């Protein structure tokens, strides 16, 4: 054990970073640590955060307090004359006035100014220098600084020296509550975005994911203004040909698993843009679910959780081994790590125009085909719909699937109306001859208890056939209800599962279930119909 005098000298040495002035942001704290290394942030976290520790695998373990997930009902966007007509107002983008924003901003600054030291991280959002956003994060917790060190694109020494003024600033005062009596506040949590000021204010939540999604929300506003499609998806590229593809899908559809392909480079796992020059990742890292993680289920993620990574809200055993099955704190345990920790990652995280765009859905009704080819109109319709379904709990012997519709497969982060993103997708599809596919990773031959889950082996074979071009030449037949072209053959996939009605023993039950699902699609689309073109409306299922 080191003598206490040596420990004191060592700990004081990590405080001796060059002062950084944040007075332009209204902050007067004398000690500001800018872009500390992971090693230094580890030491700060262990010293200054009560519950921080180092896991056996080397990752920093931190806890976000009472909030262990996003707080979408507490997100506000300033209603400003310059942008109010652009924004899709409603439960996703709840308006607040400029005065309320300034009250919350000042409250955050007042709190941050009471801290003995602050952490500042300057980095980039977007791997294409032509479109990247300079982001500054100001926070009071080393855990938050390390998290954004992993999630933003880390500048070189030269880039940091010439960084200049940021284009977007996050003030994370999440340890301090919002005043719930302030106009429009629903709780002591507030995540306020001003598009005009290019600032995000966080109060009353220490969940790190709010910062990541704040950056994505800003990208979702500014990218379409430049003719760039921002997307909530993963992206990969063939190691030999460089041909890229996009994978969209909500939670539980297999997006993460299917993106891990030894034949392909990972461009990114969550947030991307499609410009006139190709695709690029917005982020410099990955933020993966850690629940029930094993080296067998997700080997890439498991090995990436090491020194330099952050493990959030996990439970450790006495020897600091991580118990990924323990959900005592939350089901939403997470791990954040730099993308270069993935062996198959392509750096820089850019690629050419995608050859294929894949929408994943886990259809628990057992109605949708394992794979279908979509026209531009059908692609826009299903992109706006963003459908998947989960198996509900069984009560009195009845299992009823629960549908989820999330527009553009990323509803909580959209700023414009979903049709804006759908039109950009169709435009880029047509311009760059991208094929679009709907892949069902859910059930066939019936729903749960009657049919069978489509095997991962068969889904991987479908994805392989999409990527190698063979599925584009396969025979198809039009689905009488949904109207898209169902692939009737696919290499290494049994033909009997490809046409869903044929896979059901009870044809009448299939027809009734297909009609029911079509009705759910149509009811959901009523929300978007007013802004949709006649072409997109015509792509709706026929009941």
Predicted features along the sequence, with ranges:
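A cross-family detector of function-defining hotspots
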Residues: 270
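Gly-rich Lys/Arg/Thr-decorated short loops/hinges at beta-loop-alpha junctions or inter-strand turns
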Residues: 88, 194-199, 402-408
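Conserved lysine of the Walker
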Residues: 255
């Amino acid at each position: 054990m080191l003598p206490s005098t040596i420990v004191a000298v060592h700990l004081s040495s990590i405080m001796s970073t060059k002062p950084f002035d944040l007075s332009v942001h209204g902050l007067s704290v004398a000690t500001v640590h800018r872009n500390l290394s992971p090693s230094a942030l580890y030491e700060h976290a262990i010293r200054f955060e009560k519950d921080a520790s180092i896991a056996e695998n080397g990752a920093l373990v931190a806890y976000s307090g009472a909030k262990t997930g996003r707080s979408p009902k507490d997100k506000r966007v300033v209603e400003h004359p310059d942008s109010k007509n652009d924004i899709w107002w409603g439960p996703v983008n709840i308006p607040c006035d400029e005065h309320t924003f300034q009250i919350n901003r000042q409250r955050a600054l007042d709190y941050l100014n009471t801290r003995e030291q602050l952490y500042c991280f300057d980095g980039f959002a977007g791997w294409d220098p032509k479109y990247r956003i300079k982001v500054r994060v100001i926070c009071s917790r080393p855990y938050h600084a390390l998290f954004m060190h992993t999630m933003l694109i880390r500048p070189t020494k030269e880039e940091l020296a010439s960084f200049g003024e940021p284009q977007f600033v996050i003030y994370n005062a999440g340890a301090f509550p919002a005043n719930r009596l302030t106009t429009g506040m629903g709780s002591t949590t507030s995540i306020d975005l001003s598009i005009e000021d290019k600032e995000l204010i966080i109060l009353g939540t220490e969940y790190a994911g709010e910062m990541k999604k704040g950056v994505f929300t800003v990208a979702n506003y500014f990218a379409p203004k430049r003719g760039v499609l921002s997307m909530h998806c993963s992206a990969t590229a063939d190691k030999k040909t460089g041909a890229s593809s996009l994978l969209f899908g909500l939670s539980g559809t297999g997006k993460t698993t299917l993106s891990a392909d030894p034949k392909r480079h990972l461009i990114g796992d969550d947030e991307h843009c499609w410009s006139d020059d190709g695709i690029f990742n917005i982020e410099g890292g990955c933020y993966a679910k850690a629940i029930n993680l094993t080296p067998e289920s997700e080997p890439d993620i498991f090995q990436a959780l090491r020194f330099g990574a952050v493990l959030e809200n996990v439970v450790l055993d006495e020897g600091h081994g991580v118990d990924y099955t323990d959900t005592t704190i939350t089901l939403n345990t997470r791990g954040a790590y730099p993308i270069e920790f993935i062996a198959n990652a392509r750096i820089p995280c850019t690629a050419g125009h995608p050859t294929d765009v894949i929408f994943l859905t886990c259809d628990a009704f057992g109605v949708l085909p394992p794979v279908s080819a979509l026209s531009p109109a059908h692609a826009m319709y299903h992109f706006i719909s963003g459908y998947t379904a989960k198996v509900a709990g069984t009560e009195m012997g009845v299992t009823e699937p629960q549908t989820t519709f999330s527009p553009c497969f990323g509803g909580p982060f959209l700023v414009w109306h979903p049709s804006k993103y759908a039109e950009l997708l169709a435009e880029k599809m047509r311009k760059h001859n991208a094929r679009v596919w709907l892949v069902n990773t859910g059930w066939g031959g019936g729903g749960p208890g009657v049919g069978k889950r489509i095997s991962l082996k068969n889904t991987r074979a479908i994805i392989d056939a999409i990527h190698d071009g063979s599925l584009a030449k396969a025979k198809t037949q039009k689905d009488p209800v949904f109207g898209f072209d169902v692939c009737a053959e696919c290499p290494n996939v049994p033909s009997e599962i490809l046409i869903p009605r044929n896979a059901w023993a009870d044809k009448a039950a299939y027809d009734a279930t297909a009609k029911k699902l079509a009705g759910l699609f149509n009811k959901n689309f009523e929300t978007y119909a007013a802004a949709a073109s006649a072409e997109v409306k015509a792509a709706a299922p026929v009941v």
